Amino acid sequence: MLTAQRSRIRCREITGPAHSVALKARPPLSRDIDDIFVRRRKQEATRGEVLEFTKDQSSCDVRMRWERNTQRRVVSATVNRHLQDALDQYQMGIDEKRERLRELLESEELELFKEMEAKKETVLERQAKMHERAKTLRERRESERQRVVADKLDQLFREQSEELRAVQIKRRQDQVCTERESQIRTKEEVRRVQEEEEKLFAQMWESDRLAKEERHNLELQRQRENNLQQKAVLQTQMDMAEQQRIQAKELKQEEAQLLKDQREMLRLEAEREHRQKLQDQEKRRKQLDLSLRLKMKRLTRDRQEELALDMSILEQLLAQEKDEKQDEVLKKLERQEEQRRYREYLSQQLEEQKRLEAETEQLFESELQQAWARREAQWRLEKTARDRLMKDVMDTLRLQIQEKLNENMQKQAEAFKEKEELDRIIQANKLLDEEEKAHFREATKEYQADLLAQMMYRQRIREAEEAEKEYEFQKGLMYEEQYNKKIQDILSRPISSTTAVHPFRRRDRRCSSSGGQMS
């Protein structure tokens, strides 16, 4: 605070343009005290407002906190109540289930006890069953022993009988030859079936390839026809667009010419009105000039007549005076009296003449005014007729121009609509073209994928056939080797009744049995 006061004291010094320093006047102390008091009052008022606002804010915060806590407690109580109700219902459901299960368990236990009571056996019955079971086991064991003894005796007989061994060997050789022939015949049949299948697959492949090539060619032909048709349609649309552009240009030129004609008509109408106004002003000026000239002519004529009359009177008087110089003096007075009376009479006549001329002038003016009024009325009627005719002509011309403008605007609107329709058709054709191209690309991809799948399928079939042939060949070699080993083994050991049947013989037996069942 002191530093600020010192800075304010230093700031009282002001340097002038020369090497001199001036001091500002010190403000009065009363103003500072009043300012301090006012500032302090303002600060106290502001502090009071802040304290009041803080108190209100704190009370609002307390109230809001209490309301939030109350709302939270209410919500918590509601949730707890709903939860307790749900738990009570769940507990009631569990209790009911427990009661039902307990009743079901009791009923099942009772049924089980009843069944056990019903199935309870005595000791004598159990001993009788055990003796029966032991007897059955002894009989089964004795029958198995007898069958084994019979097999051993039969095997011993076959081993000791040379004739039986020779017959069996001969029979087995015949059977092996028959089975070999059957195997060869089966291989031939399998090879024939495979060849027929290959031919069938080749025919199907060729027919499918030809059909797909035909479809592809038809699709290409249809695509070319569609392209040519779309090209023709686009050319037609371009020609129509060019015609519409030329028509729109002509319509704009016609509209510009119509607007120019309308402006020229307005200019001519304004020029006609201006010329009519000038003509009216000229007519009015001519009327005023004519009336002024007539009035000036009349005044000039009156003055000339008065001057001529005065000159004639003076000449007569002078002549009479010259003649009367020789008369008597008495007659002079009489003549003067007569001259006075004559002058009075002349003045009266002059006044009467002026009055008559005034009346004549007035009549002339009235007749002239009537004539001018009639002429003006006639001119007004003619002007009204001309104006009406000109107005009709202008209205007709304006109506024609407006009709042409409306027709031009309608043509432009129709041309715009046709252009929009043409643009829409072009866009639709473009979309159709894109869809057809996409469909063609998709069909081409599907065709390629189909061809590739068929090639892979044929390759897999060929590989599977080759693998199956190789497997059959290896299997045949293995069977032949096993067969030879088995022949050698059979020839080298005694013949038994438990000899395994060859797979081909077993297959032939199964085929013959199935054929018999089918028949």
UniProtKB/Swiss-Prot annotation:
One of its GO terms (biological process) is determination of left/right symmetry. Keywords: Cell projection, Cilium, Cilium biogenesis/degradation, Coiled coil, Cytoplasm, Cytoskeleton, Developmental protein. It is found in: Cytoplasm, Cytoskeleton, Cilium axoneme; Cytoplasm, Cytoskeleton, Cilium basal body. GO terms for cellular component: axonemal microtubule; axoneme; ciliary base; extracellular region. The keyword Zinc does not apply. InterPro entries: CFAP53/TCHP, TPH_dom. Residues 498-519 are annotated as: Disordered. Residues 80-107, 210-339 form a coiled coil. The keyword ATP-binding does not apply. Disruption phenotype: Embryos display total organ heterotaxia. At 48 hours post-fertizilation, pericardial edema is observed and heart looping is reversed or heart fails to loop. Morpholino knockdown in the embryo results in minor defects in the motility of pronephric cilia while the majority of cilia of the spinal canal and Kuppfer's vesicle are barely motile. Reduced number of outer dynein arms in Kuppfer's vesicle cilia. Its main location: cytoplasm. Microtubule inner protein (MIP) part of the dynein-decorated doublet microtubules (DMTs) in cilia axoneme, which is required for motile cilia beating. Regulates motility patterns of both 9+0 and 9+2 motile cilia through differential localization and recruitment of axonemal dynein components. Required for cilium motility within the spinal canal and Kuppfer's vesicle and is involved in the establishment of left-right symmetry during embryogenesis. Belongs to the CFAP53 family. This is Cilia- and flagella-associated protein 53.
